[in-house]
């Protein structure tokens, strides 16, 4: 179903009790590796802040203007200073969704910014969200504007289930990994040539210990093609991964486990155009069908 970090479709389904009474929920996510996912995820909250000020001629009557765009910028600066005083696992992201207009010679009377806060547990995310709210109020006070906030969505952290992970791994071992045609491998190799160095994804998340990460990286380096065609060994841990998923909300209502199936080349950066380009390829379709079989 649609939505993961943004949209949060399964969170709204969880709100309505859709997952209660299920024996288990099994899911997958496209990736550059074939593996059983372990560990928890960050919870997150998305909130839209809309500032309203007073328009004025930026040169002729600047003293009469009250800039909503200034308020957004001051909020962003305030959150920047907050980052020093957050948990190491916490994250705060933003996107300015409305800068007011295209004319710089006007004091912008409106501006909006969308914020996402993340932390390892819901209670921590709620606490961090309250601090961001105060910064928004402070920005409005400094600029003599008003601010309205709108809750967009929120996601819970994931409850790990090692028993289901072991079941999925046995199935994955028995089925094997997807196979690819020479044309599919050539496409993956060409796509891998569009990113390098700092663009490459690290490949192994923070939920793994150092020895496992080193082994996984060595296996990837020996793959021979950009597509990883092996199953990573089962690793089970309880550490967190910094991303967020609405699968977390499912996991609080029924036992839940997840796998990764290789759908794009090794090291492909997350949330990139390269990720998107694989979604309608045979490689991406194979990954989805293979996940269903597992």
Regions found by a protein language model. Give the residues of each.
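Metal-dependent amide/peptide-bond hydrolase catalytic core
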Residues: 69, 73-294
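Histidine/acidic-residue-rich, glycine-tolerant segments that coordinate divalent metal ions
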Residues: 1-108, 118
